[in-house]
């Protein structure tokens, strides 16, 4: 997750400031205008503290809400999360969805699946949380952390290292 830019939104009148290693800290008490960015993701002050991790071009990859101070630090510093449930929002035609499900299976992480081509409410929710993009796969962890088309290494980190790494095939030398 080190290639992602991390923004931690909090309200200093209700939460302590996150540690500096968490990245860009945005205090809504000091910068009320920042609430507009959260509103575009369907988030409000009730969802704070919130972690938003983006690509350098601004594409949102991870959103975490209602996190404890420890969870905020772990997620923001790339140490993954502990979750009890995972839901994969996918489409049947999507190769990235199949890859994400394979990583979850390798990690022995049980998950439910929702096809957003068949479930309009799920599609609307993905659009809302991703800032208006129809991103598949979208993964929801315990209804508090969302990952948008995470590459396998990022997904493994989110799973807190639970994914089993498959050994790479080695080329045998011809004798």
PLM region spans:
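Secondary-structure transition/capping residues
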Residues: 49, 82-83, 137, 166
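Thioredoxin-like thiol-disulfide oxidoreductase module
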Residues: 26-47, 115-134, 140, 159, ...
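Short phosphate-engaging motifs
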Residues: 15, 33, 96, 122, ...
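Small/polar loops that bind or transfer phosphate-bearing groups
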Residues: 26, 64, 89, 114, ...
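Conserved small-residue-rich
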Residues: 84-142, 150
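Local sequence-structure signature of Cys/Sec-based thiol-disulfide redox active-site neighborhoods
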Residues: 1-25, 79-112
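Extended, hydrophobic interaction surfaces within ordered domains
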Residues: 1, 5-76
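Non-catalytic, surface beta->alpha helical segment in thiol-disulfide oxidoreductase systems
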Residues: 54-80, 141-175
């Amino acid at each position: 997750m080190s290639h992602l830019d991390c923004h931690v939104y909090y309200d200093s009148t209700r939460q302590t400031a996150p540690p500096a290693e968490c990245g860009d800290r945005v205090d809504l008490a000091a910068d009320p205008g920042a609430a507009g960015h959260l509103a575009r993701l369907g988030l409000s002050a009730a969802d704070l503290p919130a972690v938003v991790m983006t690509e350098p071009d601004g594409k949102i990859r991870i959103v975490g809400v209602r996190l404890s101070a420890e969870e905020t630090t772990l997620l923001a510093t790339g140490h993954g999360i502990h979750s009890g449930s995972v839901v994969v929002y996918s489409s049947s035609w999507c190769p990235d969805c199949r890859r994400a499900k394979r990583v979850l299976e390798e990690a022995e992480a049980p998950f439910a699946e929702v096809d957003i081509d068949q479930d309009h409410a799920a599609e609307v929710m993905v659009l809302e949380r991703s800032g208006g993009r129809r991103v598949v796969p979208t993964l929801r962890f315990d209804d508090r952390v969302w990952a948008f088309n995470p590459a396998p290494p990022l997904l493994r980190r989110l799973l807190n290292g639970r994914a089993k790494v498959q050994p790479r095939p080695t080329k045998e030398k011809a004798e």
